[in-house]
Amino acid sequence: MSATPRPHDLVWLNHASALEDIAEPWVAQQWRAALPVVVRRDVDDQARVPVGVRGMKREQRAAGWVQARNIVRSVTPEMLVDREVLLHSPFVSQPPVQGAIALTLHRWPWGWGVTGSTGYALATEIPVLHAASDLDLLIRASQPLDREALLEWQTRVAQLPCRADTQVETPYGAFALNEWLRDGRALLKTSRGARLTATPWHREE
């Protein structure tokens, strides 16, 4: 893989042994290389890619690392909101997928995608969705976005047939859109921890 993986991307590895520094015993029993891991936010002095492993139970999440050379496939959140992908998903009748389809009917001035359990289900066709599942949304924003357009997005998201939350990804981290619109500031999750900021598109030393 030549492109640098970004947080929330799903990546497949060339071998189970490519997953490094995993302590949780359930991973060896449940995870195999045919299943993707999700890129998370962290830093490593060995230039490895930080990833998370999803288990069968909701509480089963494990953090690990992989060498970029061992990644053989990558699916981004944006790839999962192609309308044809959504319409042909085996989970098309589930409320989170219906919600994603509804959002594709509008042309947004930014790239966006689906993460979380809905993204995992769309990418793998593994039935981890149910009627009460949330829809986790991601907006990629390298530059500040128009507030009125974001308010329109929030209005449409509030009308979806499921609970939905949006994170906005900036060059310096990610923040909850509803928090930022409501308070004028938000907790920015960065690779080195979280910080409260009103300017998530600006680096703070």
From Swiss-Prot:
The yes or no answer to whether the keyword Chloroplast is present is no
What is the similarity comment for this entry?
Answer: Belongs to the MdcG family.
UniProt-recorded name of the protein? Phosphoribosyl-dephospho-CoA transferase
The encoding gene: mdcG
GO terms assigned for molecular function: nucleotidyltransferase activity
Q: Which reaction does it catalyse?
A: apo-[malonate decarboxylase ACP] + 2'-(5''-triphospho-alpha-D-ribosyl)-3'-dephospho-CoA = holo-[malonate decarboxylase ACP] + diphosphate
The residues responsible for catalysis, as annotated, are D134, D136
HAMAP family under this entry?
A: Malonate_MdcG
The protein's role, per its UniProt record: Transfers 2'-(5-triphosphoribosyl)-3'-dephosphocoenzyme-A to the apo-[acyl-carrier-protein] of the malonate decarboxylase to yield holo-[acyl-carrier-protein].
Q: Which residues cross the membrane?
A: none
Assigned EC number: 2.7.7.66
One Pfam family name is: MdcG_N
Which residue pairs form cystines in this protein? none
Q: Which domain of life is it from?
A: Bacteria
